[in-house]
Amino acid sequence: RQMCIRDRRTNKLYQKIKEIVASGELGEIRRSQWMINSWWRPDSYYQQSAWRATWGGEGGGVLVNQAPHQLDLWQWICGIPVKVFSKNINGCHRNIGVENDVTMLVEFANGATGTFTTCTHDAIGTDRLEIDLDGGKIVVDNSKTAHVYHYIDKEGNPCTEDYLNEHMNMMEVAMLTSGNGAGSKLYTEETFENNDGWGFQHTTVMQNFAAHSKTGSPLLAPGEDGINGVNLANSSQLSAWTGREVSNPCDPEEYAAELNKLIEAEGKFPVRE
């Protein structure tokens, strides 16, 4: 049995969110967005080694180095996109030739949309995941605090956004948009915190693998899941290189051909077979 080191799956917040989404208590996902810019990297970082931030040595930039954990979590919770359109900027405010600024738009099998934005030139940084669902919304800030909102009707019973759309009159809408706090009558809110220290996630995912090997208990990050993040990163790159929407997974031969063009133009490493 194989595992992949996707240790962020041990974060209690993301486990709770996955449980809520998978349970269906908030209905289907309508859209999701993750802005993850909390890994500022100056030029000195990229100059540490000859392979860093190269097409031939590393295979790309932020999508293969910093963002893989979030690409994994996004798909683990929200599902695997079927279409990808991406605008990736190479060497954005940095003296490198690979992507370090990514804006990705995806579509899921149920028609839901999603965006994933990341860069390495934001020294302040943001880490915020939002998931809009039929029956509410989930917001995670800095991978430490999660707010889960449930829509409610006038009697305080759970309902959907469709129900609110059909039953709210214009007077109620006017009160809501006037900023008088009426919005709190539309939903309930739960807050969850995660204060696990650095290193906890790495040890936990390894302990999980050891327990699986010994007792057969379920893996948090089975090996076959590892390809999902690679596929999405590749689809994002191919879309950016060609300027068009691509399927996910993308055509591996077309991806390899386009990557080799960049490796050859870079002139630092041999092209890939």
Where are each of the predicted segments found?
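A contiguous, mid-protein "functional segment" used to position or interact
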Residues: 219-255
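Short, small-residue-biased leader/transition segments that mark boundaries at the very start
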Residues: 1-5
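Glycine-rich phosphate/pyrophosphate-binding beta-alpha loops
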Residues: 68, 93, 117-125, 197-198
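C-terminal glycine/acidic-rich active-site capping loop/insertion
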Residues: 103, 108, 135-221, 246, ...
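Short, hydrophobic alpha-helical segments
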Residues: 78, 206-217, 234-241
